[in-house]
Amino acid sequence: MTILINALGIVILLGALYLLSSNKKDINKKLIIKALLIQFVVAFLLVKFPLGRIALQKVSDVVTNVLSYGKEGLGFLFGPLADAGAPTGMIFAIQVLGNIIFISALVGALYYLGIIGFIVKIIGGAIGSVLGTSKVESFVAVANMFLGQTESPILVAKYLKDMSQSEIMLVLISGMGSMSATVLMGYAGMGIPMEYLLIGGALVPLGSIVVSKMILPEVVPSLADQDLQDDLAQAEAAASKEVKIDNKGDNANLIAAISQGANDGLNMALGIGASLIAIISLVALVNGLLGVFGISLEQILSYVFAPIGFLMGLPKQDILTASQLLGSKLVLNEFIAFGQLGPMLSGLSYRSGLMMAISLCGFANISSMGICISGISVFCPEKRNVLAKLAFKGMLGGFLVSVLSSLVVGLIIAI
């Protein structure tokens, strides 16, 4: 029964994407099927194939070890306050948010040295060749395995002005459906296994292509609609270019790149901290008001998103929990949801815990729309109106990317 419900969930999700589609007749069914099949293969290799699981665990250990070096800088600056084992216990602002500064600096260095760009170009080129997506959008989709929603477009900033609306939609969906490497240790610090996060990140490019190319597929030229012809012309122009990934940005040298990365990390940590203070306090206020009626915001969200929890094929006792977490992620943010999931994992099965974690991977929430519009339009002001027009569907698409990845992994485990 679990397998049937899980499979039904994938079918219903694809049906929902079809209903959301702006150009139903132009959906490239061959592309969608190919991307889905490859996503299933990747999921199988990571969660069922013995060598794949061993490799994933090794990579997870390496990533965790590398990212943990941020504790050295935090220990120097904050002393025992940076040690979770000290009498002061866990101090989220220091031990979780503080580590973002180191990771952001590391990403800045890898980005400047061209290491991230090289990986993106290899994997993105392979995906583009197999699926027929343009080089630009393939690179951006893959870049979101490592970079955030406003960071990945930097790689191809000079091509943004030539991108079609379908390609812009993929930029939005892959951005909001992904995680940045800079926050991985933050999630891990809340009790989420790095292995779970890496699986979720690996499935982002293919899931983003499936979702975006159903919601807004590339258009077919029509003599009756000049706008469609213009959109197609822009897509062909962007696809025909030899895409050169920009690694240097505005940085003069490696030291400047590291410094810029650290500053970006500080701003990100401050932004996340400010959001958490505001959101947690406001939720407490709302729950205080709702308490008069004997309900809470968490209970409301659990029932609103219950159909998704059911279609994930989870045990009955886990459905409302998963639904409430999904609601918290979409309405509030993923940090709140991961913070709630972490303490629960020990009481969940491997399948339930992994599915819930993957479903929360990604930046898709209400505030992300504004972040994407303002962040990406800095590189391409002429696309601001297009970004604003597509942002809401982009957010829903990013949310559904994580749900689709969760359903795919859940089905692989259940079979």
Language model regions located:
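Intrinsically disordered, low-complexity non-transmembrane regions of multi-pass membrane transporters
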Residues: 1, 61-62, 72-81, 217-265
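N-terminal alpha-helical transmembrane segments of multi-pass membrane transport
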Residues: 1-93, 256-259, 263, 272-284, ...
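Structural signature of hydrophobic alpha-helical transmembrane segments
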Residues: 1-11, 95, 295-299, 356-368
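Hydrophobic core segments of alpha-helical transmembrane domains in multi-pass membrane transport
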Residues: 10-21, 35-47, 100-109, 177, ...
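Hydrophobic alpha-helical hairpins/lids featuring a short glycine-rich hinge
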Residues: 69-133
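Alpha-helical membrane segments and immediately flanking helix-loop junctions
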Residues: 130-189, 204, 322-408
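Juxtamembrane and boundary regions of transmembrane helices in multi-pass small-molecule transporters
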Residues: 161, 185-243, 380, 385, ...
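Transmembrane helical segments that form the transport core of multi-pass membrane transport proteins
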Residues: 263-346
